[in-house]
Design a protein with these regions (language model features):
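C-terminal target-recognition/interaction regions appended to catalytic cores
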Residues: 1-108
């Protein structure tokens, strides 16, 4: 089910206008949390992934940093698209580390 199937969740100006473009454009902010990083974060036309100051999408390294990959982490691919998929589909490493610590405490 998509938002278009639930009219009460739509803004009045979009109700009944199923023929419209549904993607969202937006810019990230330096002082606010990031949008969820998806596999298409390198394209500004697929979400709120425009760089905060520059007129471009995020780089692979910027997306990886938002997802908490270490700065020295190397994605072993020559394809920007595959690297973006790896980053967008990943559980953020810092989240996984913290969750693992909690699970360890509970199981001990």
């Amino acid at each position: 089910m998509a938002w278009k199937d639930i009219p009460h969740l739509q803004l009045d100006c979009y109700r009944g206008r199923d023929d419209r473009f549904r993607d969202v454009y937006g810019r990230l902010f330096w002082d606010k949390p990031s949008s969820t990083i998806t596999t298409k974060f390198i394209k500004i036309s697929n979400g709120r992934f425009a760089h905060p100051d520059e007129n471009r999408g995020l780089s692979i390294r910027e997306g990886a940093t938002i997802q908490s990959f270490p700065k020295e982490y190397i994605f072993k691919t020559n394809s920007i698209g595959i690297a973006a998929k790896l980053i967008g589909n990943a559980v953020p490493p810092e989240y996984a580390r913290r969750l693992g610590k909690i699970i360890n405490k509970v199981e001990v």
